[in-house]
Amino acid sequence: MGVKGQLLQDPFLNILRKERIPVSIYLVNGIKLQGQIDSFDQYVVLLKNSVTQMVYKHAISTIVPAKAISIPIPADTQTEQDEP
C-alpha cells in the first residue's frame, strides 16, 4: 500500500483505538467480528473483546464504527477523489 492509503487508514484506525469506539469488522469471507481496536500496524489489527484477536488486514473487507467519526485530513493533502 502506498502513502495515500496510509493518509486515511492510520488516522481512521487511530481515532477508533484512542476513543475506544466499538467496531464491527467484516472479513472477505463474510465473517463479522466485533470489539475494540487495541492496536494495529502495517499488516494486522488487534481486536479486543473477551479475548484479543489478531486480524490480518488483507482479510478485512470493511470496518464499521458503532458511531460516526470525523477524520482530520490536512488541507494540503489531496485524496484520490480530488484527482481528475
Swiss-Prot record:
A Gene Ontology molecular function term of the record: RNA binding
Protein name: RNA-binding protein Hfq
Sm domain residues: 10-69
Organism: Nitrosomonas europaea (strain ATCC 19718 / CIP 103999 / KCTC 2705 / NBRC 14298)
Annotated disulfide bonds: none
UniProt xrefs under Gene3D superfamilies: 2.30.30.100
Gene name for this UniProt entry: hfq
NCBIfam families: Hfq, PRK00395.1
Single GO BP term: regulation of RNA stability
Protein keywords: RNA-binding, Stress response
